[in-house]
Every structure is written in structure tokens, then in C-alpha cells.
């Protein structure tokens, strides 16, 4: 590779994720985005369970049955001279841990809001995570083909609830059955909407200028006048787009449209490729690593099992932070202090995997993992580095898991430890007995674990309720005090899947008492990988 080519390759990359509340239309948007990137020719819209066209980005058996995206997949496609990497994050109620970690691997996010509902609780939680790194956010107000709330009201809500300034880029003309299109504030153009074009890219029907009589003819006098009145208000009351404020995560450009009707998606893609940052530098324990550096570095943010039902394989997803991956490269697996030759890394088009010949900073590659790679691992070309900031969250829900067939205890433990390494669930083994406690951030994770134990490890397991309120990782620098703490609290201590000591609290009162009683012991709600 010529040295001149490298900065050009990195600068054309855009790596982003979509964040939304369940059912705000995220999977549909993913489909339409890929359609624009020509990755798929007709968008397989996510329909009911019986339909054979399942969404292209949902690919685990259980996802197909339920019509939700459970695992984060990665898709790369070209758009406007850029190469876009889209990380699909599970939007459903519970898949939070995986989703949170995915947000550590992107340089910008698209926030999708259901315009009939406004800002919802899951969106608030995800926005908090993007705030940790001030990730730039673009906003798409979706579902304009339905009856929606007043657009000004939606902008106010985003500003007040999510504490970010809004700069409308497009503005809707009507909504529901009367939805006619959007006006672009910065190009002074109106884009007209046609129904029934959801599966293909619409022909652009553009009217130049706000005072153009063609506009009145196309949308009707009333709506045209309403648009002009609203725009006067908007231009007086809202923020102008400011690139620096956007890059610092203080302001979000807002686009209106309908993903199902495939309208408005290209508007935010244009914004993404024009404004969103190219791959950024990242903090490691000893220094910051710039994306312009020639030596390869990267970190693993997710592990996924069985992307290929024919093989019991697991793939570790690695975000390339700097340098270039080339087939057959020797990389240092820093945590293990081992050098490995990576000859068969993967690139992704969800579920269709192709072997990567090369990848640059900003790209995501898949490494085959036979149980040696963990979330948070760093790979380099020899430098002893560890990237920081990839979190594990204390679970909020707990159940005891046991076998229908007690002879399969070994398989059960193996399955649970593997699933916990993958971040699907957390496992705790109490020091006092042989129980296995499963901890999750949401209820759906429990179902996923049982169905995967059955299909991948041939183990039938059932849950029982258990009296656990929360868990905290514990550490103490004073060995003597720690020993006393361990001796007196043995009945509440457990090891997690990575053999880290954890305090399992039956009630919050119990936890508070323990924290008061042992001020030298640190109780952690999150743990960095």
C-alpha cells in the first residue's frame, strides 16, 4: 500500500450505529439504508412470522421467529464516495448490554424517533451511553406516513429530555394520509413523496424554491401556505446547523421522513457522509491512538456464537482503530501475550460473510474465536496496549438455572460460560453451593439463553426464581481487610464467568449495610473488560 493511499482510505470511512426505542422502525431503516448502498436490491421488509422475506439484517433463528434483531450485526456499503459501516444494534426491550458496548465502537449515531410517540425511555438510556464519549448524533423523525405529533413539539422534547440542541435540516409537509414530502432548509428544495414506493428507490421529484407556484400545485394551496408559515416560525425559533457543535455532541441535525415508505432516508445519508466524522482516535491505557497511525491496532467489542449454524463457531468483532489489516498478518493478542496469524478474518453483509483481504481504521472485522478471545481484548502489531472504556454492566434481573437432566452439568456450565463471554448473559457461581445464577439486563435475555443452550449445547434447562436484588463486583487494596470481608460474607459471594469476585445482594438494604460495614472494599456497578 502506498502511504498516500492510507489517509484517503481512512477519511472516506464512516462508522455509525442506529439507536432507537423498540418498534421505532430501526430495522426498516437499516434495510432502506442498505438499499441505497446497493447492498440489497429489494428491501426485505420485516413482516409477520409467516412471511418468507425476513429482514436481511436479522439472522439468528430466534430473531427470525420473533421479528426482532437480537444480535448486533455489521454491514458495510458504499455511499457518496464514502464507505459506510453500519452496526445494527438490538432495539428490543432488553438487549441493552450488547447495544451499549456496540456504541463504544462507532464514531457517530443515528437516533430514530417514532414521530407519533416522541422520545421514549430506551432512547434516553442509549443517549446517556453516547454521552460518555460525546458521540455526534443525527436524528431521523420516522413514520410521517402516520399521524404524528406536532413537529415543533417533537424538537422541543428532544432538546429538553435529551439535552441536545436540534437543527432541523428538512421540514415535513403534512403527515399521515396528507403527507406530501419535505422541504430542505439549506438547499431551498422541496422533495415530493409518492406512496407505494417502499421497496425501491423513489425517483426524485424536486421543486426548487419555496415560492415556486409548482409547490402550491403539487401539495395544494393550504399545505403550501402552512409550510411557509411554519418555516418562518422554525427559522426564528430553532438552531442553525453548526458543524463544530455537531461534532462535539451538542447539536443534532434533524431529518423527517418515513422509512417504510422509503422516503427521507437518503437525506440523512447525505448528511452522514458529509458531516459525520471519519474514524477517530481512541484512548488506550498508556496513550491515545490516532486513526492515522500506520500500525494496526483494534479492540473486540462483541463476541457472537454460531453465525454459521453448520459450524459451532464463534466470531469476535474487532473495531480497527488504526492501521490496515492484510490477510495473513501477525497480530499480538495483548492480554494473552501471544502472537497469532490472522489468515481468515471476515467482513460482513449481515450473515453473508466474505473473507477480508484488507480492512482499514474504522472498519469492523470478524476474528474466528475458539474460546481464547474475550470482549475488551486488544490486538496490536506488537505494542503492549489496552484500549479502555468497554463496559460490563451489573445485571438487574436474576434467576437460578437448573437442568432437567442432572448428568449434563458440565455442558451447562460450559454453555453458560461461553454465552457470558459473548456478553449474552452473566453467570454467577456462588462460593457456598453448586447453584448457577444467571443475571441479565432484560427478561428476553433469559429466553435467549434457554433456547440457545438447547439448540447449541443440547442442554434442556429451566429457571427458578431466586432472592437476589443486585450484584456488585468487589475489590480491595488491603488484603487483610479483604480476607475478613470474604470470610464473613461467604454466603453472599460468587464468581462470575471470568472468575471475578462478585457480591450477590438479596436486597438493596443488605448491599447498603455491607458497603457501610466495609468502607475499604470497593463495590462496582460496571466493570471494564
From Swiss-Prot:
Keyword match Methyltransferase: no
Q: Where does GTP bind?
A: 20-27, 88-92, 142-145
Which SUPFAM superfamilies does the entry mention? Answer: EF-G C-terminal domain-like, P-loop containing nucleoside triphosphate hydrolases, Translation proteins
Q: Which residues form the tr-type G domain?
A: 11-280
Fetch the CDD domains from UniProt: RF3, RF3_II, RF3_III
The GO molecular function terms of this record are: GTP binding; GTPase activity; guanosine tetraphosphate binding; translation release factor activity, codon nonspecific; translation release factor activity, codon specific
Q: Which PANTHER family match?
A: PEPTIDE CHAIN RELEASE FACTOR RF3
Q: What is this protein called?
A: Peptide chain release factor 3
Q: Which organism is it from?
A: Pasteurella multocida (strain Pm70)
